[in-house]
Amino acid sequence: MDKAKFIDVLSDSTGETAEKAVRAALLQYPDAGVQIRLHTRVRTPEVARPVLERAAQEGALVVFTVVSPELREFVHASTAELNIEAIDLIGSLIVRLGTFLDREPINLPSAMLPLSEEYFRRIEAVEFAVKSDDGKEPRNFKRADIVLVGVSRTSKTPLSTLLAQRGLKVANLPLVLGVPPPLELMEAPQDRVVGLTIGIDQLCEIRQARLRQLGMPSETNYAMREHVRQELDFANRLFAAHPEWPVVDVTKRAIEETAVIILEHLKERDERAKVVRSSLV
């Protein structure tokens, strides 16, 4: 049996940046079975040392984001002393930026920095996404930066949450077979509506898994292939009737990749709008 492998993520703040970077890199090693241990608000050598000693004992990889030069140097020295494989995710970047900008860094962990306008914008966007999930507030479609439209289990909610974390106000609407979308969708700016589609095989699998999770029988219309096909056909007819809506196929795509595609559509939309405005001047 293979020995368990650990990655200790050490941060003087929330550790979110480092953890996301590690998880993104681990996607290239599926089924690696690596366990990530997150150590947050590590701001003194006294707190860091036990983490590093345990990592040395267990042969763990240490990934760290530390802005304090003194603590960063301590971690570098300790990992060398203890013969630990370590990756400094942010230290060299801070130093190189200082050289490029000809300025000294303030050396404060992100959690200790003043709350910015962008922070409050993200909070507002997340609250908007929660209130506008699953078509709950159709009146919000007009206010949304993006309105995601698709049949059940096309990643509308996780996409809304992910995009909201970037400060975008996102609403989403589930398409139900035979039920026309609410008038509010047609009254919203049509270049903000994005259709989501998915392959029938994957959608059936996802829905069957969902039914098993809920302890429900799989022989229901929700997961039956013919019914699923009818739902997808219904959605595709709606998308075809609105060619101004970009349609994104989420089949076998991570939500992060789908989000990037949607953001690219937004960028193209904004660039077209700029061209139109400049032609009117």
From Swiss-Prot:
Q: What does this protein do?
A: Bifunctional serine/threonine kinase and phosphorylase involved in the regulation of the pyruvate, phosphate dikinase (PPDK) by catalyzing its phosphorylation/dephosphorylation.
Q: Which reaction does it catalyse?
A: N(tele)-phospho-L-histidyl/L-threonyl-[pyruvate, phosphate dikinase] + ADP = N(tele)-phospho-L-histidyl/O-phospho-L-threonyl-[pyruvate, phosphate dikinase] + AMP + H(+); N(tele)-phospho-L-histidyl/O-phospho-L-threonyl-[pyruvate, phosphate dikinase] + phosphate + H(+) = N(tele)-phospho-L-histidyl/L-threonyl-[pyruvate, phosphate dikinase] + diphosphate
Q: Which organism is it from?
A: Sorangium cellulosum (strain So ce56) (Polyangium cellulosum (strain So ce56))
The EC number on file is 2.7.11.32, 2.7.4.27
Q: Which segments cross the bilayer?
A: none
Source superkingdom = Bacteria
| Coiled-coil regions listed | none
Q: Which GO terms describe its molecular function?
A: ADP binding; ATP binding; phosphotransferase activity, phosphate group as acceptor; protein serine/threonine kinase activity
Q: Which residues bind ADP?
A: G150, V151, S152, R153, T154, S155, K156, T157
Sorted UniProt keywords: Kinase, Nucleotide-binding, Serine/threonine-protein kinase, Transferase
Per its UniProt record, what NCBIfam families does this chain match?
PRK05339.1 (NF003742)
The UniProt entry's sequence similarity note says: Belongs to the pyruvate, phosphate/water dikinase regulatory protein family. PDRP subfamily.
Supply the enzyme class, top level. transferase
This protein's name: Putative pyruvate, phosphate dikinase regulatory protein
One Pfam family this chain carries? Kinase-PPPase
